[in-house]
């Protein structure tokens, strides 16, 4: 059932994570749990401590081949040439991301409902979950553009109206991730610190930010402080491995100037107890293919 942003008690509209401010603001220590369910495994303990957990061989080699063919099909699909869900590189015009991929691919639609996938999110979030966002990311060799340091929750809170960081992302690698081909960098433990960002959100900001984000990113001073406090590590591994990470963990990736491309399936699960309201720091919500307002549990 499709639901619109619902009216809530005024207490739910208290902004506990203010951002997009006129002036730099102090960091905010996280006010919410990092694992909402019981911590009863080493994997959940690692997630609680670091804000992420790596799973080897989440997909079999056969599944990797099937999904790789599927994402290549979507990137080449001429019927999607003018589709808003397809985001292209700012300079090369190559496909960068395809959003709402679970509605474009029956294979992905089946994958997101499998217990081995959605069960991970339920464990961390301690509730039923729904899909906040799905997409495929492409980083071609030589000209693949990275993502600057950011917290996903900062954007989802400011522009989608997500009240709390009670959401998790699952990035499933469809290609080998090396330290040198733009693999994701994360700051272990940074999910416990919310970094307010400076600058008002323009109307339709998503049209530019999905290609190159300049508003809603931390300052170099912020990144320096966090890196010194938490350090930086990389998600590397064979195709089929996956990274489950907290919505507020600080992460980013460098450009890929190697011949080795990267691609991944990116799934975002939000708790049904954390459904979207009106944006906290934007003129209007982003389109539903970016921030879903269908809160039907999986």
UniProtKB/Swiss-Prot annotation:
* Start-end of Basic and acidic residues biased regions: 1-18
Transmembrane stretches, start-end: none
Which is a GO BP term held by this UniProt record? ectoine catabolic process
Q: Which reaction does it catalyse?
A: L-ectoine + 2-oxoglutarate + O2 = 5-hydroxyectoine + succinate + CO2
**UniProt region (Disordered), positions on chain:** 1-26
Biological role:
Involved in the biosynthesis of 5-hydroxyectoine, called compatible solute, which helps organisms to survive extreme osmotic stress by acting as a highly soluble organic osmolyte. Catalyzes the 2-oxoglutarate-dependent selective hydroxylation of L-ectoine to yield (4S,5S)-5-hydroxyectoine.
Q: Which family does it belong to?
A: Belongs to the PhyH family. EctD subfamily.
Q: Which residues bind L-ectoine?
A: 133
Q: How is the cofactor bound?
A: Binds 1 Fe(2+) ion.
Q: What is this protein called?
A: Ectoine dioxygenase
Annotated residues that bind Fe cation are located at: 150, 152, 251
What GO MF annotations does this protein's record show? 2-oxoglutarate-dependent dioxygenase activity; iron ion binding
| Marked site (Important for ectoine stabilization) residue numbers | 156
Q: What's the domain of life for this entry?
A: Bacteria
Q: Which organism is it from?
A: Nocardia farcinica (strain IFM 10152)
| UniProt KW keywords | Dioxygenase, Iron, Metal-binding, Oxidoreductase
Q: How is the subunit organization of this protein annotated in UniProt?
A: Homodimer.
- E.C. number(s) listed in UniProt: 1.14.11.55
User: Which cofactor is recorded for it?
Assistant: Fe(2+)
Pfam families in alphabetical order: PhyH
